[in-house]
Amino acid sequence: MLYLRLFTQGRNQVQTVNIYFLDIGGLMRKLTEEEKRVIINRGTEPPFSGKYNDFFKNGTYICKQCGAPLFRSESKFKSGCGWPSFDEEIKGAIKRLKDEDGIRTEIVCSNCGAHLGHVFEGEGFTLKNTRHCVNSISLDFIPDNR
């Protein structure tokens, strides 16, 4: 993430303006307030609100913040929890951290540390018995047929 701090000088004051940009596939774009709330401040988008919750095209889900590949569409499944669910990450793409509540396990992009969601095990949704519960707002999607 590129963080740019601009200083503008008025009559008797200096004003600071912070601008956040994300590099997605080589394109720089401004991070929205909602994206900052979830990706940087470790928030959660409302259930059933994300664009990838009921999205099942073939391709790769990438980190919205840095563009690193995170999940393949073959690992996505319908869990009914309200967020995109994956039973396997791309090897080395995800880092697991103990959540502040001491119960859940947070998942972040291993490349840039962007908050993705949480991982749960032992629920029996798939044979792999793992559910990565991910905020859609933390993801972008690259279709296989580009």
Where are these regions (language model features)?
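Initiator methionine at the very start of the polypeptide chain
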Residues: M1, V14, G26-M28
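Intrinsic-disorder-associated, low-complexity terminal segments enriched in Asp/Asn/His/Tyr and depleted
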Residues: Y3, N12, N18-Y20
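Iron-sulfur (Fe-S) cluster-binding modules
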Residues: L6
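Short Gly/Ser/Thr- and charged-rich N-terminal loops/segments
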Residues: Q9
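A short Gly-Trp-Pro
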Residues: N18, D23-R146
